[in-house]
UniProtKB/Swiss-Prot annotation:
Top-rank EC class of the record's enzyme: transferase
SUPFAM superfamilies: alpha/beta knot (SSF75217)
Function summary: Specifically methylates guanosine-37 in various tRNAs.
Oligomeric form and interacting partners: Homodimer.
Domain of life: Bacteria
GO MF: tRNA (guanine(37)-N1)-methyltransferase activity
Lineage per the UniProt record: Bacteria, Pseudomonadati, Pseudomonadota, Gammaproteobacteria, Pseudomonadales
Annotated family: Belongs to the RNA methyltransferase TrmD family.
Binding positions (S-adenosyl-L-methionine): G116, I136, G137, D138, Y139, V140, L141
Annotated PANTHER family: TRNA (GUANINE-N(1)-)-METHYLTRANSFERASE (PTHR46417:SF1)
Descriptive protein name: tRNA (guanine-N(1)-)-methyltransferase
Keywords per UniProt: Cytoplasm, Methyltransferase, S-adenosyl-L-methionine, Transferase, tRNA processing
NCBIfam families assigned to the protein according to its UniProt record, in alphabetical order: PRK00026.1 (NF000648), trmD (TIGR00088)
Length: 250
């Protein structure tokens, strides 16, 4: 059974228990679909204080992660993952992660993730060892651990067998370039709000059409930029036009 190996270099490996012990990612680990190992640069320091950071040259606020502990941790991660493993640094300066990138990463056999802290890591480490830099958005976090967990969760969902239903990943938002449609469950009526009749009809063709139309409409209203990069079929254009017309008439 094929599996994905992910090595994480982080000063806070305990944070990744959220991945290994809970939810879909935990199930993937237990099933052998995902192999997750963390490496702490502090374990590769030689001074009594286990120093992993220092002041930046040129002055300025904050501290910068030192090269040597990172490199030594990376050596161990490479031995575990193999020399072909892609090294990814989670950084606000990186390319923004999207579903297309997640699909590509899910095809890898092994990935090494670098979770920085403080003001960042020494640029010489990035130049020498990092293959790609990825960001999860235009905002600043305290470290790379949360972005790394976001990436791991998103990639794990696409591993064959990770989800309970084979179609679940394909029906998620962004998988086909659209936002997801609304979902409902029991009861049929709650606080005088009814589930749309089409979902109770049992007509699978009508349900598929309704869900596609809702996805198109939501994307148009909330993320119109996604439609600019997606070529709509004739059916999709018709459904979107109907959605807009019905919305404007209501």
């Amino acid at each position: 059974m094929a599996s994905l190996r992910i090595e994480v270099i982080s000063l806070f490996p305990e944070m990744f228990s959220a991945i290994s012990e809970y939810g879909i990612t935990s199930r993937a680990v237990k099933q052998g679909l995902l192999q997750l190992t963390c490496w702490n640069p502090r374990d590769y320091t030689t001074d009594r204080h286990h120093t992993v950071d220092d002041r930046p040259f040129g002055g300025g606020p904050g501290m910068v992660m030192k090269i040597k502990p990172l490199e030594d941790a990376l050596v161990q991660a490479r031995q575990a993952a193999g020399d072909a493993a892609k090294v990814i640094y989670l950084s606000p300066q990186g390319r923004q992660l999207n579903q297309a990138a997640v699909r590509e990463l899910a095809q890898e056999e092994a990935i090494i993730l670098i979770a920085g802290r403080y003001e960042g890591i020494d640029e010489r480490f990035i130049e020498a060892h990092v293959d790609e830099e990825w960001s999860i958005g235009d905002y600043v976090l305290s470290g790379g651990e949360l972005p790394a967990m976001v990436l791991i969760d998103a990639v794990t969902r696409l591993l064959p067998g990770a989800l309970g239903h084979v179609d679940s990943a394909e029906e998620d938002s962004f998988t086909d370039g659209l936002l997801d449609c609304p979902h409902y469950t029991r009861p049929e009526v709650y606080a005088d709000q009814r589930v749309p009749d089409v979902l109770l009809s049992g007509n699978h063709a009508h349900i598929r059409r309704w869900r596609l139309q809702q996805s198109l409409g939501r994307t148009y209203e909330r993320r119109a930029d996604l439609l600019e990069s997606r070529s709509l079929s004739g059916e999709e254009k018709k459904l979107l036009a109907e959605y807009i017309r019905e919305r404007d008439d209501s």
